[in-house]
A protein has these predicted regions:
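Transmembrane alpha-helices of multi-pass inner-membrane enzymes
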Residues: 42-44, 365-405
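Hydrophobic alpha-helical transmembrane segments
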Residues: 64-70, 112-158
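Hydrophobic transmembrane alpha-helices and their immediate junctions
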Residues: 195-198, 222-234, 239-249, 334-373
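A conserved mid-to-late transmembrane alpha helix and its immediate loop/hinge
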Residues: 210, 214, 316-354
Length: 405
């Protein structure tokens, strides 16, 4: 494949970030089709070589988890089993392909072109979010958000209702604030794979996350920035040579945290408030998780989640919730202790990376691998191609840039 065609192919990645939630068509009630529905085919555009062994390992793990869920899970709604299982298998295929593919290398002289497209995407979505927030402040509603919602995979009516009661959230081109923040962090990590400092873009992405009103997004950005500060400056060589710079950068960061502290403290307080989004995402579902880990009938088959969640009577606002907004909890409900052991194994790998990253965290390596488990706390829609794209895109670029560590 020629260089020009290769570049056009990789320029698809920032474009997909703009279109990831735009609905092309609909199959049934719960299967919207978007550009990332065709992600396995799109990955072939970047393919140089594939390890069949790795792909078979990934598919084997997916098949084992599917069999476990079918054999030990209780079925509460058999009509949705096939669709839900297909989504899980699809995610396994996407992750397996990204892990097993050797991607075509992006030549250095083309880095700037791809980065410009990413900068353009960031500028567009953050500017749109700013316009939405301005309209919300001035009018108490958002006709812009309502108009965009008609073209998205899911309705954001609950966000619009939240705004009517005085809330301030934005979604830009995405179906919910948390997914908007998740997309911005994914873009941020994609840009960081190019190994350059982008303070203006960092500031714009942080502004977008704040405009989204996503507490998970704000805390993740703070965590990732603190980690990078620690990796850069908490080693003997850096302390000797860069101590003033380290103190100045930390001071500036802490000023930002102090300014944001009222918001952070309010959202932390919401963890104990039944009916709040924070409570529903983190605290409320713990009773379900505990039941899944301690009872034989605690595992739920694919497609039966709504009925299982509703049976616990946990309120999300004024209504009893029927969904799980926490991906880790969802995995435990579907796979019980397998999800726990796999999560602990993965986090063990990340912790080893952290220990060795002081003074050598090349291109945000630790943050990239930490992004996968952290992203589980943003949404329960983890068995969707849209979520999968946000997770794998930075990895695709890292491999295409030949970053081996």
């Amino acid at each position: 494949m020629s260089t020009s065609i290769r570049i056009c192919s990789y320029l698809l990645l920032p474009l997909i970030y703009l279109l990831v939630n735009v609905k092309i068509a609909q199959l049934g009630e719960s299967f919207p089709i978007t550009i990332v529905t065709f992600l396995p085919v799109l990955l072939l555009l970047f393919l140089e070589r594939i390890s069949v062994k790795k792909l078979m390992i990934a598919l084997g793990i997916g098949a084992g988890l599917t069999a476990f869920n079918y054999l030990f899970g209780q079925s509460l709604d058999a009509s949705k089993y096939v669709t839900s299982t297909m989504l899980f298998v699809y995610i396994v295929i996407i992750i397996g392909m990204v892990w097993s593919i050797r991607f075509k290398t992006i030549s250095p002289h083309n880095h700037r072109k791809i980065l410009r497209f990413f900068y353009l995407v960031v500028g567009l979505v953050v500017a749109l979010a700013a316009v939405e927030m301005t309209q919300i402040i001035l009018t108490g509603g958002s006709s812009i958000m309502e108009s965009i919602s008609k073209y998205l995979i899911y309705s954001n009516s609950y966000v619009l209702n939240f705004i009517k009661f005085g809330g301030k959230r934005t979604t830009a081109l995405y179906f919910e604030p948390a997914f908007f923040a998740l997309a911005l962090i994914s873009i941020w990590l994609s840009i960081k794979q190019f190994g350059i400092k982008t303070p203006k873009t960092d500031a714009m992405i942080l502004a977008g996350i704040i405009l989204s009103g996503s507490f998970s997004g704000v805390m993740t950005f703070i965590l990732f920035y603190l980690l990078e500060w620690a990796f850069q400056y908490l080693n003997k060589e850096a302390i000797k040579k860069k101590l003033p710079l380290a103190l100045i950068s930390l001071a500036v960061f802490l000023v930002g945290v102090v300014i944001a502290f009222p918001y952070i403290s309010t959202r932390l307080g919401d963890l104990g408030t039944e009916g709040s989004s924070s409570y529903y995402r983190i605290v409320g579902p713990l009773v379900m998780v505990g039941y899944s880990l301690t009872h034989i009938d605690g595992v739920v088959r694919f497609g039966s989640l709504y009925e299982y969640v509703a049976s616990f009577g946990i309120f999300n606002g004024a209504d009893v919730g029927k969904t799980i907004d926490n991906g880790l909890y969802l995995l435990i409900i579907y796979f019980s202790w397998f999800a726990v052991f796999l999560s602990l194994w993965y986090m063990g790998k990340v912790i080893k990376m952290m220990i060795n990253a002081f003074g050598d965290n090349r291109n945000f390596r630790v943050q990239l691998y930490l992004f996968t488990p952290v992203s589980l706390f943003f949404t329960g829609s983890i068995f969707s191609p849209e979520y999968a794209f946000l997770i794998v895109c930075p990895f695709i670029l890292r491999k295409a840039l030949n970053i081996t560590r």
